[in-house]
């Protein structure tokens, strides 16, 4: 760029007419040409400096280009008219040359717009007007030529001013493109019908090929499925004889938990039997043997091997050895009905045969109360009760109306009192 003294922000842009007026008076003198040349050289230098930044400074480049073009035109006009004395005559060519300069970009733009419209027409129709050159046709791609003619005809109608509200008009035949090779001259209607027939034939051929391919694929799939089914091995059916051999092999090998499928297959000696089949059958057999088999208890069968009494397991030999001997526990249960209504079954043994247990709590409290009263009352009360108990059998024996059940009840009551007195003595010793 130039120095700061030469460049400033006070520069006001002037129109082209003002520039012409400023230099119109000095065209006859020679220093004017030198001045114009100096300005042109300086502008060109500035343009070269900004050329590297023309994308960032597009307006500056445009201003410099316009100024350079204006000064060039002025310099050429001054040199051409330097011999003329009339200033007005000398300035007229400058104005005539200057006016087209402003309209020149518009012409180029119009050319570009015309080229774009023609390109759109080419891309949307298969025909071209007569005034289009072959060179412009060669610049078009092939994809644009193969587009449908109906769309192009519709677009052409819209450009000519016809809208959608006009009546429908029949399609008109249009001339062919220059690029197409003309082998035969056929009317457009025949070409259209032939094209339709060709398309129909190609579609029919494609459908036939598609059907043939589908049939071939279905046949190949059917053959492959049948071959795969034939190659697939049938599932092994375990007959009773085969299962019997399997069980025998397990017994020889020491059980299902020890035997291996390979050993079982070798012992069974069956043709076509594989290790996988033996393995699957062995797994099913193990699952079947793990299930607990239900054992229904019959009424006439033998008794259980173990007897439960009060949470204690008693071996069966004790029940067989002491099963038939009557005990005091049986009489107490039978006469007083403290625990059950009847005697226990014969295969159960009574608890007092093996260990001594305290009687139920209600009789115990009752006898404690009696002993407490006896001890507080003195020895006379106990002797009186004892004499009453001992004398009662004679009285009962004398009375003919009393039965044997009452005598048994009194004897059981006497034995029970003796047992409770012994138990109370043992409890006293335990307390001390």
Curated annotation (Swiss-Prot):
Where is it mostly found? nucleus
Query: Which keywords does the record carry?
Result: Coiled coil, DNA-binding, Flowering, Nucleus, Transcription, Transcription regulation
Feature: compositional bias, Low complexity = 201-231
Report where it is expressed, by tissue: Specifically expressed in vascular tissues of cotyledons, rosette leaves and cauline leaves. Not detected in the vegetative shoot apical meristem.
Question: Domain of life, per the record?
Answer: Eukaryota
Q: Where is this region: Disordered?
A: 123-237, 354-412
- The keyword Nucleus is assigned to this record: yes
Q: What happens when the gene is disrupted?
A: Early flowering under both long-day and short-day conditions.
One GO BP: gibberellic acid mediated signaling pathway
Annotated DNA-binding residue span(s): 261-286
Q: Name one GO molecular function term.
A: DNA binding
Instruction: Give residue ranges for domain HTH myb-type.
Output: 230-290
A GO-annotated cellular component: nucleus
What switches on expression, per the entry, is described as: Up-regulated by SVP. Down-regulated by high temperature and gibberellic acid treatment. Not regulated by photoperiod, circadian rhythm under long days or vernalization.
Compartments where found: Nucleus
Establish whether keyword Nucleotide-binding is in the entry: no
PANTHER family recorded? MYB FAMILY TRANSCRIPTION FACTOR, MYB FAMILY TRANSCRIPTION FACTOR EFM
Q: How does it assemble?
A: Interacts with JMJ30, but not with SVP, FLC or CO.
Q: Outline what the protein does.
A: Transcription factor acting as a flowering repressor, directly repressing FT expression in a dosage-dependent manner in the leaf vasculature.
- Protein's name according to its UniProt entry: Myb family transcription factor EFM
What is the species listed in this Swiss-Prot or TrEMBL entry? Arabidopsis thaliana (Mouse-ear cress)
